From Swiss-Prot:
Role noted for this protein: Component of the acetyl coenzyme A carboxylase (ACC) complex. First, biotin carboxylase catalyzes the carboxylation of biotin on its carrier protein (BCCP) and then the CO(2) group is transferred by the carboxyltransferase to acetyl-CoA to form malonyl-CoA.
Domain CoA carboxyltransferase C-terminal: 39-293
Main location: cytoplasm
Family listed: Belongs to the AccA family.
Pathway: Lipid metabolism; malonyl-CoA biosynthesis; malonyl-CoA from acetyl-CoA: step 1/1
Protein name: Acetyl-coenzyme A carboxylase carboxyl transferase subunit alpha
This enzyme's EC code(s): 2.1.3.15
Intracellular or extracellular location(s): Cytoplasm
Pfam family, one: ACCA
Subunit note: Acetyl-CoA carboxylase is a heterohexamer composed of biotin carboxyl carrier protein (AccB), biotin carboxylase (AccC) and two subunits each of ACCase subunit alpha (AccA) and ACCase subunit beta (AccD).
Top-level taxon in the UniProt lineage: Bacteria
Length: 323
């Protein structure tokens, strides 16, 4: 698949286009231009390194939404075996913007749950652009309860712009469904390992992200509102999204510094979409390390640790000026 370049990546795109042009010429010519191709390839790689070493929060937001970025089912295919998807909330419908099911990770039975966006127009519409309705969150709750019943660790993958705010979703109890998931996950008697793989949009993300460990991919985001939404409220213009992204502190490094996440998983050069298999290998290692950390822990110790972790959120210290 041809790589889609973002607007700030245009210098890289121009170099890559030149490299492709030279490769085409070399195939149809007896002239050896392999050295020039190699030189330009190294130049492109260095340019990518330099560019990605100094990304703004808004640019990170763009990468997190990249249309070729791996989604939950892509990681399921790479990391898990014997995946059997489970459907429906047993109350209203099956919301396919959240997928989940039984699987094996490194031979260990587990439950996998995650947001799922679409690749083309038809699939995006079917999956509601990764914005779950209440039945999606209730399906997730059902699968979590099932995992608890059989003592299976839960892996959740977060990638959503937010919960769907439609009238029907609100009428069917969107806020109640999200709130219940927060309550359920806080007390589940089984390990929960959460990874933000793309967008972590507000309560829609948090509803499957109350974990014993929360990790983020290097170029993913996690915030209470999108930069555009924040800009529209504060500046009355979505054009101020870059400033809003800066103010929101939505990057993995910022959230790690605040103690809101536990680990950052580095991405391949140019982002996860440039090397999905390489990203999957890095993610596999991080998930295995996290699972190993909790496997020998008693249920009581696990829940106590989770409670203390949640209670540590939002703590601050007041000081007297001049003291």
């Amino acid at each position: 698949m041809k790589t889609t370049f973002l607007d700030f990546e245009q210098p890289i795109a121009e170099l890559e286009a030149k490299i492709e042009e030279l490769r085409f010429v070399q195939d149809d010519s007896a002239v050896d231009i392999s050295e020039e191709i190699e030189r330009l390839s190294k130049k492109s790689q260095q340019l990518t390194k330099d560019l990605y070493a100094n990304l703004s929060p808004w640019q990170v937001s763009q990468i997190a939404r990249h249309p070729q970025r791996p989604y939950t089912l892509d990681y399921v295919a790479e990391l898990f075996t014997d995946f059997h998807e489970l459907h429906g909330d047993r109350a209203y419908a099956d919301d396919v913007s959240i997928v989940g099911g039984l699987a094996r990770f490194g031979g260990h039975p587990c439950m996998v749950i995650g947001h799922q966006k679409g690749r083309d127009t038809k699939e995006r519409a079917a999956r509601n652009f990764g914005m779950p309705r209440p039945e999606g969150y209730r399906k997730a709750e059902r699968l979590m309860r099932l995992a608890e019943k059989f003592g299976l660790p839960i892996f959740t993958f977060v990638d959503t712009p937010g919960a769907y705010p439609g009238i029907g979703a609100e009428e069917r109890g969107q806020s109640e469904a999200i709130g219940r998931n927060l309550y359920v996950m806080a007390e589940l008697k089984t390990p929960i390992i959460t990874t933000v793989i793309g967008e972590g949009g507000s309560g829609g993300a948090l509803a499957i992200a109350v974990g014993d460990t929360v990790m983020m991919l290097q170029f993913s985001t996690y915030s209470v509102i999108s930069p555009e939404g924040c800009a529209s409220i504060l500046w009355k213009s979505a054009a101020k999204a870059p400033e809003a992204a800066e103010a929101l502190g939505l990057t993995a490094h910022r959230l790690k510094a605040l103690g809101l996440i536990d680990k950052i998983i580095n991405e391949p050069l140019g982002g996860a979409h440039r090397d999905p298999k390489g990203m999957a290998a890095l993610l596999r290692r991080a998930l295995a390390d996290s699972l190993r950390q909790f496997q020998g822990m008693s249920i009581d110790a696990l829940r106590e640790r989770r409670f203390e972790r949640l209670m540590a959120y939002g703590k601050f210290k007041e000081t007297t000026p001049g003291a």
